Amino acid sequence: MKHLVFVGFLVFLFQDALSQYDPKALATLEAMSAKFKAMGAFEANFSYTLTNDVDNINEEFKGKMTVKGDKYRLALPEQEVINNGTTLWTYLPDANEVNIDNYDPNSEDVNPSKIFEIYKKDFKYLYLKDETIGGVVCEVIDLVPEKTDAQFFKIRMNIVKRDKTVKSFTMFDKGGNRYTYTITEFNPNIKVDDSFFAYDPKQHPGVEIIDLR
């Protein structure tokens, strides 16, 4: 009985901790966000893994992102996603088609231009610990959505303690899937024209255009 009471007490403490807006976590998140905003534009190579222990899923691929303000271009093995802040293009080379849609800034889909400030709205945050990851000391912070029906129930961010850049982040969904993005190469303050963030049909003659707007 005493054991059950003790376990219940620990659960209570854990839930209470996650209900807080941890000032230590906020200080790190604010510093990280300010750093990326000051860059203007950046480019990053990354690895992506999808794991699910129950379904025995373990997938990995590499990609590249270019971000400038609200605009981004995401190059993946089987698709390229381009967003100019208003319109979203998804180019599928194997299908020889491009889907065009209006950009929804409130979508729960992974958005490279928003991950650095996602904590500012509808999330609670908690500093967990300092941990050495890949030889780099990182501050580990959990973001927990305030909405119970959110697509992801937790996002864990590993932020480099020395310079407040993002080392990696993992998104946990209710189906047991874990989506991990790890930055493998980072180039800040790059020069890139706004036209880079718009799909150019001249580069893909004969492609089928599917306009979903």
Language model features: what each stretch is:
Residues 19, 126-205, 210-213:
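Gly/Pro-enriched, hydrophobic low-complexity segments
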Residues 16-57, 70-71, 203, 208-213:
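N-terminal leader/targeting segments and the immediate start of mature chains
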Residues 39-41, 60-62, 69, 83, ...:
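Extracytoplasmic
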Residues 62-110, 179-180:
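An acidic-aromatic
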Residues 48-50, 79, 92, 170-173:
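Beta-turn initiation residues at beta-strand->coil junctions
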Residues 103-137:
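Flexible, surface-exposed loop/linker segments and immediately adjacent secondary-structure boundaries
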Residues 4-13:
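Sec-dependent N-terminal signal peptides
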